[in-house]
């Protein structure tokens, strides 16, 4: 097992692959199913992992986007994501990593403060999305958003690159780190 690198495999023709990393297996599977139902012009492949590193596999396709899913109700979820981040090559953070925080709808039950996840995403200069994956409509909307983000990261949207999208998303961030 070694660090995951973005360009260690050749891209598949009209194929986009996303890796969802998180400790909530049921929520990840539901999100993956919603993504596969979403309208996509590319062949969509969704892989799930509880943590990184991934076992070495010759058959694994190139991963175009990694989404780290943090459940705000579980400190284990945050710890697993933090430990997994060190197993990524730095080149992945050039527009091919995103964080997804779930469970923010019920603040009273959160064991992780939102600012902790905001600071984590800011540290790695990666976009942070919030969504309550337990609600089907929200999950479907997030699945569509992730599919579109994946198509851009895979290079299937003319005129837009992952790095370009990252700079656009970073420019639209509301709070600065100093305000937190």
From Swiss-Prot:
Disulfide bonds: none annotated. It is found in: Nucleus; Cytoplasm; Chromosome, Centromere, Kinetochore. Pfam families: CENP-M. InterPro entries: Centromere_Cenp-M (IPR020987), P-loop_NTPase (IPR027417). One of its GO terms (cellular component) is kinetochore. It comes from the Eukaryota. Keywords: Centromere, Chromosome, Cytoplasm, Kinetochore, Nucleus. Transmembrane segments: none annotated. Its main location: nucleus. Component of the CENPA-NAC (nucleosome-associated) complex, a complex that plays a central role in assembly of kinetochore proteins, mitotic progression and chromosome segregation. The CENPA-NAC complex recruits the CENPA-CAD (nucleosome distal) complex and may be involved in incorporation of newly synthesized CENPA into centromeres. Component of the CENPA-NAC complex, at least composed of CENPA, CENPC, CENPH, CENPM, CENPN, CENPT and CENPU. The CENPA-NAC complex interacts with the CENPA-CAD complex, composed of CENPI, CENPK, CENPL, CENPO, CENPP, CENPQ, CENPR and CENPS. This is Centromere protein M. It comes from Bos taurus (Bovine). The gene is CENPM.
